[in-house]
């Protein structure tokens, strides 16, 4: 098995409902270790840049508005098959389709306000982590 990194964003809806600790605890219980973390309020430019691949899609403006509506917690997580493991913990994008016990089933209210973001591939994770964290802000876990 490969040790990977993935990007996780706890979105404004979950932050606003005080689910940060519960969500991070689930990642850690699954063996995903935070190696970088920021609590921040995304600017419009940051949100537009991060979601640039969706710029031509109909939901882009609403997505940017939502992601800038309150603070988020951005983390780089490290662990065995981190991308897939993280996505399994999150559950389906649509919380109505998410398996019971997943983050989106437990904390999300809609496909638009779905509690968290997770990288969809190792390549995406590398790009997304670099978007938010400089190399000197990432600290591999040695203990």
Curated annotation (Swiss-Prot):
Its cofactor is Mg(2+). Keywords: ATP-binding, Cytoplasm, Kinase, Magnesium, Metal-binding, Nucleotide metabolism, Nucleotide-binding, Phosphoprotein, Transferase. GO terms for molecular function: ATP binding; metal ion binding; nucleoside diphosphate kinase activity. One of its GO terms (cellular component) is cytoplasm. It is an enzyme of class 2 (transferase). It holds the Pfam family NDK. It catalyses: a 2'-deoxyribonucleoside 5'-diphosphate + ATP = a 2'-deoxyribonucleoside 5'-triphosphate + ADP; a ribonucleoside 5'-diphosphate + ATP = a ribonucleoside 5'-triphosphate + ADP. Gene3D superfamilies: Nucleoside diphosphate kinase-like domain. GO terms for biological process: CTP biosynthetic process; GTP biosynthetic process; UTP biosynthetic process. It is found in: Cytoplasm. ATP binds at residues 11, 59, 87, 93, 104, 114. Major role in the synthesis of nucleoside triphosphates other than ATP. The ATP gamma phosphate is transferred to the NDP beta phosphate via a ping-pong mechanism, using a phosphorylated active-site intermediate. Belongs to the NDK family. Homotetramer. NCBIfam families: PRK00668.1 (NF001908). This is Nucleoside diphosphate kinase. It comes from Acinetobacter baylyi (strain ATCC 33305 / BD413 / ADP1).
